[in-house]
């Protein structure tokens, strides 16, 4: 029941784990009138419902409920599930192709970088929180924090410091 939504290249995506723990990816669009069936991320979800007319889909993308279904004489629910997107889970990441029917060849795409990604052990990590900060501040100071890693061994010693070098910096020469 863990799920997340995102927009990638203009395609609204819903990724969700089914009962077996397998990741599924779909276009986050109701097949009736095109409203999004999910927002944000979370866990424990067993179904997703369109906020407009209430069409309901399960974690495998199958259409499970249509309010006043008798008004849709002969509708085949099998043909009106969420549109499935190709998805691969590897190295602790989920890779979705927003333009089916292409299947992602992650090994070929990553090439030698796959060894580096595997060494991070990202599959052992889990999402902690998402924050959006709307504040009046000097964006250059924020960017500088992400371009220098000197602070990692102190500020992030129990999270990312063990997997990153804390004595490197990136400067643009200005």
Would you name each region that the model predicts?
Residues 2-100, 104-115:
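Rieske [2Fe-2S] iron-sulfur-binding domain
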Residues 88, 93-174:
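C-terminal catalytic domain of Rieske-type non-heme iron oxygenases
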